């Protein structure tokens, strides 16, 4: 067991709650102690939903452990069914209740209800939230469609031609507490509609059990979030022959690849690449004169597998950044992240320990961090601009406005979200350089956070460190003055490299000339 004050993913029953809360006419009975009801806050506070999740807790207490907790489970299941009248019932247990081994799913199936009951056996001590969401969606899909497996023929992607209608697809994977899922679905539906393709079902977000049974009315599946939907897509392919897409449409290049992949599977004519590129402003902005200073900016990326991989591709191929760190907390996506990192000549960081991520971030000395809510905190401590690209997220990352990550509009949003922190960083540096002019005063409002950046504190802390420099090296007045002209977000790396150079050359005092020589040496 590991004690920590932050975790990237909750236990698997939180993933099950995400699926239940995303859908209609479904109820989830969770065998759990009173303390596990905290998960409600994730949906009412973070997602800002107007209703509680469709979850009934057995909420057993310490005194109940001396009696028959199985009867408590049956009582809560009966009351939930009578009150909420769901079309499908999910039954599971939290990490604490797993130790009691009451087997609530088996109890529910023995109560004689006339509805599908999905028994969720989620190993709380070896799996995490995304796996729990994936397994829940998979078990739900399997339960509701298993009777149609033997009687159904394999579905051809070209069936729409035989039926004389427009092709239909399912969009699978979006859920509550996913990153911008609501807006991504709207954007992808719009793109598909422009291509003459209809959306059959979106699941689990907004779907009902009846919609799950209609999945086989479509020709192919769009696997929008592999962490949630890939297992279900594989099962549908294995049992019904339904093909599914592998390209995630985040960024211009991936969106074009996604459209072409869908067209190939449905035997539709391929579209003109240049015509598609003009649908977003990102390609032109990233090629414009104003964006030249972005080229080569060092970026550190950490998040869920889907968004981290997509961010790395956009950063490298579409914005001209240098990716100096790439990682994920999603062990299910570790192989794909490692492959992407290898292509970028960096070592992948696979961990759920935020301190390891912060340490790697510090060593990489990036000029921009793309990560989760925790990386935003870490970057703020290190004085590095940051943009959130992945869950876990704060309520401020669930905007009321339309703000997708996928498709053409998603590319526009990404450009704004990633580039603006860098622009603000440049502005901060200019103010730092000219702070002695009468127009500027210390304590001005910083764009890097809600508190001002006191440049004197930064310089003073640097001076204190200089007293303890490696091998007794001393910074002269000219050296310190020149160091202050270096942008604050790379000042630490420049200082470290200059000291390394001085040690290598046996230089006891670092002047402005030494700093210039070190820069030439490392470049």
UniProtKB/Swiss-Prot annotation:
Alphabetically ordered keywords of this record: 4Fe-4S, ATP-binding, Chlorophyll biosynthesis, Iron, Iron-sulfur, Metal-binding, Nucleotide-binding, Oxidoreductase, Photosynthesis
GO MF entry, a single one: oxidoreductase activity, acting on iron-sulfur proteins as donors
Cofactor annotation remark: Binds 1 [4Fe-4S] cluster per heterodimer. The cluster is bound at the heterodimer interface by residues from both subunits.
Name by which UniProt lists this protein: Light-independent protochlorophyllide reductase subunit B
NCBIfam families according to UniProt: DPOR_BchB (TIGR01278), PRK02910.1-4 (NF002790)
Active site: 290
Disordered: annotated span: 451-470
Function: Component of the dark-operative protochlorophyllide reductase (DPOR) that uses Mg-ATP and reduced ferredoxin to reduce ring D of protochlorophyllide (Pchlide) to form chlorophyllide a (Chlide). This reaction is light-independent. The NB-protein (ChlN-ChlB) is the catalytic component of the complex.
Entry binding sites for [4Fe-4S] cluster: 36
Catalysed conversion reaction: chlorophyllide a + oxidized 2[4Fe-4S]-[ferredoxin] + 2 ADP + 2 phosphate = protochlorophyllide a + reduced 2[4Fe-4S]-[ferredoxin] + 2 ATP + 2 H2O
Catalytic activity, EC: 1.3.7.7
UniProt source species: Prochlorococcus marinus (strain AS9601)
């Amino acid at each position: 067991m590991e004690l920590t004050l932050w975790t990237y993913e909750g236990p698997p029953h939180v993933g099950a709650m995400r699926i239940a809360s995303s859908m209609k006419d479904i109820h989830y009975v969770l065998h759990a102690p009173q303390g596990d009801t905290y998960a409600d806050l994730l949906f009412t506070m973070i997602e800002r939903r107007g209703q509680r999740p469709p979850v009934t807790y057995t909420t057993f207490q310490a005194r109940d452990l001396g009696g028959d907790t199985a009867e408590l489970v049956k009582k809560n299941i009966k009351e939930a069914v009578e009150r909420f009248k769901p079309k499908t019932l999910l039954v599971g247990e939290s990490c604490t209740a797993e130790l009691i081994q009451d087997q609530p799913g088996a109890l529910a199936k023995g109560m004689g209800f006339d509805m599908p009951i999905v028994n969720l056996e989620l190993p709380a001590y070896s799996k995490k939230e995304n796996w729990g969401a994936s397994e829940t969606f998979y078990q739900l899909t399997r339960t509701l469609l298993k009777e149609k497996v033997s009687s159904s023929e394999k579905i051809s992607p070209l069936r729409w031609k035989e039926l004389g209608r427009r092709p239909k697809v399912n969009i699978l994977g979006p859920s509550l507490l996913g990153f911008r899922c609501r807006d991504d679905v709207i954007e992808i539906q719009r793109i598909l509609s422009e291509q003459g393709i209809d959306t059959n079902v979106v699941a689990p977000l907004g779907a009902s059990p009846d919609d799950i049974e209609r999945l086989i009315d479509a020709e192919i599946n769009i696997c929008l979030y592999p962490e949630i939907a890939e297992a279900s897509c594989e099962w549908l392919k294995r049992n019904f022959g339904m093909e599914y897409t592998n390209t995630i449409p985040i960024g211009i290049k991936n969106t074009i690849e996604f459209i072409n992949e869908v067209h190939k599977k449905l035997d539709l004519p391929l579209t003109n690449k240049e015509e598609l590129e003009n649908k977003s402003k990102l390609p032109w902005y990233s090629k414009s004169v104003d964006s030249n200073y972005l080229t080569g900016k060092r970026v550190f990326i950490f998040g869920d597998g889907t968004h981290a991989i997509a961010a790395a591709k956009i950063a490298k191929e579409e914005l001209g950044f240098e990716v100096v760190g790439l990682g994920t907390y999603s062990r299910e996506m570790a192989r794909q992240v490692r492959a992407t990192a290898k292509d970028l000549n960096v070592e992948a960081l696979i961990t759920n320990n935020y301190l390891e991520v912060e340490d790697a971030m510090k060593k990489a000395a990036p000029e921009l961090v793309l990560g989760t809510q925790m990386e935003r905190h870490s970057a703020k401590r290190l004085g590095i601009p940051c943009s959130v690209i992945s869950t876990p997220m704060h309520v401020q990352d669930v905007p009321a406005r339309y703000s997708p990550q996928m498709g053409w509009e998603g590319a526009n949003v990404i450009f704004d979200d990633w580039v603006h922190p860098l622009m603000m960083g440049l502005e901060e540096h200019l103010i730092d350089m000219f702070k002695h002019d009468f127009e500027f005063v210390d304590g001005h409002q910083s764009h890097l956070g809600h508190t001002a950046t006191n440049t004197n504190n930064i310089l003073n802390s640097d001076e204190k460190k200089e007293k303890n420099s490696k091998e007794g090296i001393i910074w002269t007045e000219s050296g310190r003055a020149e160091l202050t002209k270096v942008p604050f977000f790379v000042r630490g790396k420049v200082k470290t490299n200059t000291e390394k150079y001085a040690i290598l050359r046996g230089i006891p005092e670092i002047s402005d000339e030494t700093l210039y020589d070190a820069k030439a040496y490392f470049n």
